[in-house]
From Swiss-Prot:
This is Anthranilate phosphoribosyltransferase. Anthranilate 2 binds at R188. It comes from Pectobacterium carotovorum subsp. carotovorum (strain PC1). Anthranilate 1 binds at G102, N133. Mg(2+) 1 binds at S114, E247. Pfam families: Glycos_trans_3N, Glycos_transf_3.
Length: 355
């Protein structure tokens, strides 16, 4: 489906033709009857949403109807496809690269594990194009933290690609690439509940990575999001939830759904699988962006808390597996060695210097 390239106006606009109106009404009626809609119908619906073509009441009803019934992977994939089609362009690399990202919304207020993991993974030789936004549940989201480090959030797509080439890591700020999200924001704020938009962020990286490690805020989402990644054509990915966190956990078992060349395997991981000690969730508590900056600066220079290093090592270990390094214990040890060397912090400094 060809999505309009016209910039959305500040006011709600009606679909352009009578046929569009009938089709959209049919889609909405199916949702009101608690029926699933197809990937194509979902793509049409979310295309209309990000162009500002739905009334607030229609948008609210559609989102709540999907939430109460439970979103189907095809519906989530259709929504992601619409958002990616509307995204600002990014020069996609032809080499293997990944995203490591969480939905947020887990309410744990932990340190920025996935952001730290991106820099450590790059220092392990991987290429990471991290998609992120401001905080959802914690006091400091990935964008908040990077700003505290002096890293430029509105770096151009070309400059971000150059950073990915040179440093092995770049950060793509969601609002810079997904302008249509703003049409849904007032309704989302009024609803004050999670909707499909809460899980779309990790699925709409404008760089379109073939690999991804995605954390979700609920164990019930692990398998459906893996199914969605399959529909979207990811080569290899892992969806995780660990003990209330949208990360690989070291304080509790982690539920994993791993996609590998079209096949999905579900399994459980504990700290023992990585050869790591266990630590309590309270040991991973974060704070303000400035406090988290200081915590991660110490960690990435090799001077941080053991619990923080272990948490990052576990996530990097699973990310390394997605690139074909299958031994999680060896991967975790490699990550710890990189953390203790201070190499990862040099990448933070180098990325900040490009601002």
């Amino acid at each position: 489906m060809q999505l309009s390239s016209t910039k959305p106006s500040s006011k709600t606009r009606e679909p352009s033709t009578a046929q569009d109106i009938v089709t959209m009404q049919n889609i909405l009626e199916k949702l009101y009857r608690a029926e699933s809609i197809s990937r194509q119908e979902s793509q049409a619906l979310f295309g209309a949403i990000i162009r500002g073509e739905l009334e607030a009441s229609q948008l609210a009803a559609a989102l709540i109807s999907m939430k109460v019934r439970g979103e189907h992977p095809d519906e989530i994939a259709g929504a992601a496809t619409a958002l990616l089609a509307d995204a600002q362009p990014f020069p996609r690399p032809d080499y293997l690269f990944a995203d490591i990202v969480g939905t947020g919304g887990d309410g744990t207020n932990s340190i920025n594990i996935s952001t730290a993991s991106a820099f450590v993974a790059a220092s392990c030789g991987l290429k990471i194009a991290k998609h992120g936004n401001r905080s959802v549940s914690s006091r400091s989201g990935s964008s908040d933290l990077l700003s505290a480090f002096g890293i430029k959030l509105d770096m151009s797509a070309q400059d971000s690609r150059q950073a990915l080439d040179d440093l092995g890591v770049c950060f793509l700020f969601a609002p810079q690439y997904h302008l249509g999200f703003r049409h849904a924001m007032p309704v989302r704020q009024q609803l004050k509940t999670r909707t499909v938009f809460n899980v779309l962020g990790p699925l709409v990286n404008p760089a379109r990575p073939p690999l991804a490690l995605i954390g979700v805020y609920s164990p019930e989402l692990v398998r459906p999001i893996a199914e969605t990644l399959k529909v979207l054509g990811y080569q290899r990915a892992a969806v995780v939830h660990g003990g209330g966190m949208d990360e690989v956990a070291i304080h509790a078992p982690t539920q994993v759904a791993e996609l590998n060349n079209g096949e999905i395997e579900t399994y459980e991981l504990t700290h023992r699988d990585f050869g790591l000690d266990t630590y309590s969730l309270s040991a991973l508590q974060g704070g303000t962006p400035e406090e988290n900056r200081d915590i991660l600066a110490s960690l990435l220079q090799g001077k941080g808390e053991r619990a923080h290093a272990a948490a990052v090592a576990a996530n990097v270990a699973l990310l390394l597996r997605l690139f074909g390094q299958e031994n999680l214990r060896q991967n975790a040890q490699q990550a710890l060695e990189v953390i203790h060397s201070g190499q990862a912090y040099q990448r933070v400094i180098a990325l900040s210097a490009r601002g």
